[in-house]
A protein has these predicted regions:
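Short, well-ordered beta-strand elements
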Residues: 36-46, 97-101, 124-127, 186-187, ...
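N-terminal lobe/hinge region of extracytoplasmic solute-binding protein
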Residues: 43-93, 231
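Extracellular/periplasmic solute-recognition and catalytic clefts
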Residues: 239-250, 269-334, 360, 364-366
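Gly/Pro-rich hinge or "lid" segments in bacterial periplasmic/extracellular proteins
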Residues: 159-175, 181-184, 189-267, 275-276, ...
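Detector for C-terminal structural segments
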Residues: 352-393, 444-454, 480-631
């Protein structure tokens, strides 16, 4: 049996001795100020659609869950795994069985902070059983049944068969590899060894739920009508919730780690114009956070009264943004969906668009000074995972992708001419209407769309394409646009759930983003989507990490080389106005860490640019010291 936490704890003790002096001498100016407020105030314009963390995988929804529900483990501010609801864990010698020993002082409370029950291993079993019931339509189900023994067979047995299909055998829950050995010992049995399994447990799919409360609530569990439809075991309680009015998170005094929760109250006020009015409210001291677009950032930096109020945005996560072509359009007839189907199924048409996009120009609304720093040419961001010193995005077929220029005016025009001939023969009409909605609550997205429209129509010609940009709703945008197929081309994003390239196949493999499996002409001899076949082959490799990574690289390269998507980069850059120190937040490229307020403080004096880079240097030095100690 391999014991994990105890060994790492001894190493960390030595590391902290090495960095203690560094911490004392390299604290940024903002960190030297005492926290003068227990309250953190923000505006928001997109309301949550559910509090049911067992079904949602939407960032806007689970940003609340991350703060009110704890996970088995968590990441600290340096990206190191720390115990949370699990005090320790171990792995069997064959890597198939993971055992978690839960703390006995973790409790469930209601929205008033009143004790309900202790958190036990049975709560994790109840959550898995709920997620793996196909009737509950959980977006997290595949995360569990991809790795847990017996989970997929159980899930299939709960599903309603399609017309003409035989139902799958109904399986007993005991065949699934999720087990409460006793009240405080939880065990997962996997299909195959999964080296990154621990990182998976920080995601919503592995959160617990109290089964008694779940059964009492029935279909009302997690309904986003109030704060009394879930229980709480995390750092905060959603003490007030009036949809499209306000949300208030209050420190959970019963939480096992309450001493490390420094912000007592988080006040989030709804305003559909939040992105527009937040900067001025921040300047007046009425709120504590505001996104600053590129135009305003230039003005503030030039003004001595505001120059010290903003700092660069920290790129703390690995959310990847990419333009996706929709192969199953469901938009209004005025945008000619049938004509779009003809066009999008022509590879030369897609490649003309692919090579016509000037990403540097499109990124200027987010990062006006160094736009190239937030851009990359793959779906998986660089530095996400590596092996033997080689970055995954440089491996195999992806290495060829990153070596080639994507914005290429000559190629765009060459593919345009090929597409015109083929599309004319296929019965398409010109210009091809390209419906491209955006979320008005996202700072800079409207400006980006305008830049893209002008730049691409200017290059390819308005006799070839007609890009139509339109503001979508601020609340329920994902449901109204992407999930309904209500777009021709759409800038989508995906954040990793665990530390393996497989996580970046999820939006394409299940077809939820742009339905690549419905593209014509890309099935193999067995009638299976070529992309699906490549992903299946990569997922089947569990004993050779080099071969596994190279196989996933081939699958990802397939999407890019055939222009199913246009890789973009990170979603933000530029500047932020905020009274939090971003280097105090939990850090991990996956899971929920980036959404948590635990460990952070509200400062009277916000970071300026100099403070930010000083803090970043200190943080990177601490990370380097840890890495050196662990080698």
């Amino acid at each position: 049996m391999i014991m994990h936490w105890e060994v790492k704890a001894m190493k960390r003790t030595l590391v902290w001795l090495l960095v203690a002096t560094l911490l004392l001498t390299a604290l940024p100016a903002a960190a030297e100020e005492a926290a003068t407020s227990d309250v953190y105030r923000t505006l928001y314009s997109g309301e949550i659609t559910t509090l049911n963390y067992l079904v949602t995988t939407t960032t806007n929804d689970f940003a609340i869950s991350a703060n009110v529900i704890d996970t088995l483990v968590e990441y600290d501010r340096l990206g190191e795994v720390q115990p949370s609801l699990a005090e320790s864990w171990s792995t069997s010698d064959d890597g198939l069985v993971w055992t978690f020993n839960l703390r006995k002082d973790a409790t469930w409370v209601d929205h008033n902070g009143e004790y309900y029950a202790n958190v036990t291993a049975h709560d994790f079993v109840a959550a898995a059983k709920y997620i793996l019931n196909a009737q509950n339509a959980s977006s997290s189900a595949s995360i569990l049944y991809d790795v847990i023994a017996g989970a997929e067979e159980y899930y299939d047995g709960t599903a309603t068969p399609a017309e003409g299909e035989e139902p799958a055998p109904v399986m007993e829950w005991e065949t699934v590899g999720v087990k409460a050995v006793d009240d405080y010992t939880l065990q997962y049995t996997l299909k195959n060894p999964v080296p990154y399994f621990l990182s998976m447990t920080t995601y919503v799919a592995f959160m617990p739920v109290n089964e008694t409360f779940l059964n009492e609530m029935g279909a009302n569990f997690g309904v986003a009508t109030g704060n009394d439809t879930i229980l709480y075991c995390g750092a905060y309680i959603l003490s007030e919730f009036a949809p499209q009015e306000k949300r208030v998170l209050t420190k959970n005094e019963s939480n096992w780690d309450a001493d490390n929760v420094f912000i007592e109250r988080i006040e989030q006020t709804y305003n559909k114009e939040a992105s527009t009015i937040s900067p001025e409210l921040y300047r007046r001291g009425e709120i504590d956070s505001a996104s600053i677009d590129s135009t305003l950032a230039a003005d503030w930096l030039a003004d001595p009264e505001t120059a010290d109020l903003i700092r660069p945005v920290r790129q703390s996560g690995f959310y990847s943004y990419f333009y996706a072509f929709n192969f199953d359009p469901h938009f209004d007839e005025q945008y000619e969906p049938e004509n779009w189907k003809i066009a999008v199924n022509n590879e030369n048409f897609r490649k003309s668009i692919f090579h016509a996009l000037d990403k540097i120009s499109a990124a200027l609304p987010y990062e006006p000074d160094y736009p190239e720093t937030i851009l990359f040419d793959t779906i998986t961001p660089p530095a996400f995972v590596s092996l033997h010193g080689e970055d995954y995005t440089d491996m195999g077929a992806l290495g060829e992708v990153t070596a080639a220029a994507q914005f290429d005016e000559a190629k765009a025009l060459e593919y345009k001419e090929l597409a015109i001939a083929e599309l004319t023969e296929a019965g398409a009409t010109f210009p091809v209407k390209i419906y491209m909605p955006y979320n008005p609550s996202v700072t800079g997205w409207d400006e980006e769309c305008q830049v893209v429209e002008q730049q691409m129509e200017g290059l390819l010609g308005t006799d070839y394409i007609d890009i139509i940009i339109e503001a979508g709703p601020t609340t329920g945008f994902l449901d109204a646009v992407r999930r309904n197929g209500n777009f021709a081309i759409h800038k989508c994003n995906w954040g990793p759930d665990y530390a393996d390239p497989n996580t970046y196949t999820d939006p394409f493999y299940d077809g939820t983003y742009n339905q690549p499996q419905m593209a014509l002409y890309y099935n193999n001899e067995e009638g299976v989507s070529e992309y699906y076949a490549l992903v299946d082959a990569a997922r089947a490799i569990t004993d050779d990490l080099q071969a596994r990574y190279e196989a996933f690289a081939e699958a990802e390269a397939f999407l890019i080389e055939h222009a199913f998507v246009i890789p973009f980069g990170f979603g933000s850059g530029g500047y932020d106005a905020n009274r939090l120190n971003p280097f105090e937040s939990q850090y991990a490229p996956f899971g929920l860490s980036g959404e948590r307020y635990k460990g952070q403080k509200v400062y009277e004096v916000p970071m300026n640019t100099d403070d930010y880079f000083e803090a970043m240097d200190a943080w990177e030095a601490e990370r380097a010291a840890l890495a050196a100690q662990e080698e």
